[in-house]
From Swiss-Prot:
UniProt subcellular location: Cytoplasm; Nucleus
Motif PIM motif per UniProt: ranges: 320-337
Family to which this protein belongs: Belongs to the SPATA2 family.
UniProt keywords, alphabetically: Cytoplasm, Necrosis, Nucleus
Annotated Gene Ontology cellular component terms: cytoplasm; fibrillar center; nucleoplasm
Protein name: Spermatogenesis-associated protein 2
Subunit structure as annotated in this protein's UniProt entry: Interacts (via the PIM motif) with RNF31/HOIP (via the PUB domain); the interaction is direct. Interacts (via the PUB domain) with CYLD; the interaction is direct.
Length: 511
């Protein structure tokens, strides 16, 4: 710093304040604005070490410690504090003989609110000691006997420069506060910079811009790194963790393209035959719409059903059925005879199949108003006549006293289920079995009991559980009929093996 320029400003400062005391007209000084401009120019000299800006007071250290330690301290508050201390110094070197300036009360309002709330106690004591004040009893500062007027003037001039420096730092802060800088940052920059106020503000702006650019670059690098890591994880992770929907659709498509299994019921164009010799199971079959159109009544028309083919050279009973263009598979759930339930026979859309030599198919269509109250006298099922087709074919003598042989059902050519796809033994065994069934001797008309199934005389068997009587033909035909009491099958025994004699029923017995 130019020492000559500073000494010249110090001399003008002293003359300005001494001129206030001179009462001679025309010699009183006006405003100190030119002094402020000169002081700002002095503090903004280029390439000047900050340590040479202040000689007595360590200005930047005092301001920095105050801003760090006191929450009520700020650059504007420090400006007021330095201005008040400057006034004390001016009064002391202008009026040293006045007693009111020989002591300073620390508990007064202006001192408490403007000085003690802004500066630290040690800094206040150091500044007042330069002016010649010593602390007394902790509540006041008392002036020493000998007062060096030159030193007091120099302290006053330093306080004046401190006030101007606070104004400059306030101006710098107003320019860079939008960049996130605080007053303490401005003080730190001003303390270490050899530039003027404009140079300090430009340096702070450049630093803020470089920091923002660095932050943006680091964020961009972090994003690129995270993206590359994610790409690496996606590359090395297993490709398939679970089957996708497309795979499921592909599998389901080929599942649907598989040929039907042997256990599924299908109306194909290969010849089908029935084995008469094997003990097959009864099946419950739900017909397709194409089959429902073939018969509109429980008995059906023989012309609507496929005919029985002649016996081939191997002695097999062959039956061929060519389905319609739909070729719809009939999926059934066959049940053994032991688990047959009577309520299944009462359903309106059920086909009952007895796999015997002459297979009998009985279909119950939904009852109409005319046939709703008509039931079979033998089995109790709803039908259009007094006897259903099954009971009519099993017991022809009871339903047709005229003696005409019962006509075979036209449904004999229908075969269902996987068991019916197997090849059968010769027809001769079936014919022998039929001859055996129909050649049984008729019961004597002198019997005292009537059959509980066909209501014919000659019941020679009795159930040991429900006491129901049955003839020999019905015993073979209805041996799977469930017992009414214990939901089990009937246990028929010949009457001659019972220890009691069955009584004669005077009325027809229904199922």
């Amino acid at each position: 710093m130019d020492t000559k320029y500073k000494d010249d400003l110090f001399r003008k400062y002293v003359q300005f304040h001494e001129g206030k005391v001179d009462t001679t007209p025309g010699k009183q000084s006006g405003s100190d604005e030119y002094l402020r401009v000169a002081a700002a120019t002095l503090l903004s000299l280029h390439k000047v070490d900050p340590l040479y800006r202040f000689r007595l007071i360590q200005f930047y250290e005092v301001v920095e410690s105050s801003l760090r330690s006191l929450s009520s301290s700020s650059l504007s508050a420090l400006h007021c504090a330095f201005s008040m201390l400057e006034t004390m110094a001016i009064n002391l070197f202008l009026f040293p003989w006045k007693k009111e300036f020989r002591s300073i009360k620390t508990y007064t309002g202006p001192f408490v609110y403007y000085v003690k709330s802004t500066l630290l106690e040690k800094d206040i004591r150091a500044i007042l000691k330069f002016m010649g004040y010593e602390p007394e009893l902790g509540t006041a500062y008392k002036l020493k006997e000998l007062v060096e007027s030159l030193q007091v003037k120099m302290v006053s001039f330093e306080l004046f420069l401190a006030k101007v420096e606070c104004e400059q730092m306030l101006g710098i802060h107003s320019q860079v506060k939008d960049k996130g800088y605080s007053e303490l940052d401005v003080v730190t920059e001003r303390k270490s910079s050899t530039e003027d106020a404009r140079g300090c503000s430009d340096a702070l702006r450049r630093r803020a811009e470089s920091r923002e650019h660095l932050t943006t670059s680091m964020a961009r690098v972090a994003l690129q790194k995270s993206a590359s890591e994610r790409a690496a994880k996606d590359y090395y992770k297993p490709r398939v963790t679970k089957p996708s929907r497309s795979v499921d659709a592909y599998d389901s498509y080929w599942e649907s393209r598989k040929p039907p299994s042997k256990a599924s019921l299908s109306l194909r164009k290969e010849p089908l035959a029935m084995d008469v010799g094997e003990d097959l199971k009864d099946e419950i079959i739900r017909p397709s719409p194409s089959l429902l159109t073939m018969s509109s009544s429980p008995h059906g028309s023989p012309d609507d059903l496929p005919s029985i083919s002649p016996i081939n050279g191997l002695g097999l009973l062959r039956s061929t059925y060519f389905p319609t263009q739909d070729d719809v598979d009939l999926y059934t759930d066959s049940e053994p005879r032991a688990t047959y339930r009577r309520q299944d026979a009462l359903r309106s859309d059920i086909w009952l199949v007895k796999n015997d030599a002459h297979s009998i198919y009985h279909k119950r269509s939904p009852p109409t108003k005319e046939s709703a109250l008509s039931k079979c006298q033998n089995c109790g099922l709803s039908c259009s006549s007094s006897l259903c087709q099954r009971c009519d074919s099993v017991c022809p003598s009871a339903s047709k006293p005229s003696g005409f042989p019962s006509k075979a059902s036209a449904h004999d050519s229908l075969v269902h289920g996987a068991p019916m796809r197997e090849k059968y033994v010769g027809q001769t065994q079936g014919l022998d079995r039929l001859a055996t069934v129909h050649s049984k001797p008729k019961p004597s008309t002198t019997a005292t009991s009537r059959c509980g199934f066909c209501n014919r005389a000659g019941a020679t068997n009795t159930c040991t559980q429900c006491s129901k009587v049955s003839c020999d033909p019905c015993l073979g035909a209805y041996h799977y009929d469930p017992c009414c009491r214990k939901s089990e099958l009937h246990k028929f025994m010949p009457n001659n093996q019972l220890n009691y004699k069955s009584t004669q029923f005077s009325h027809p017995v229904y199922r």
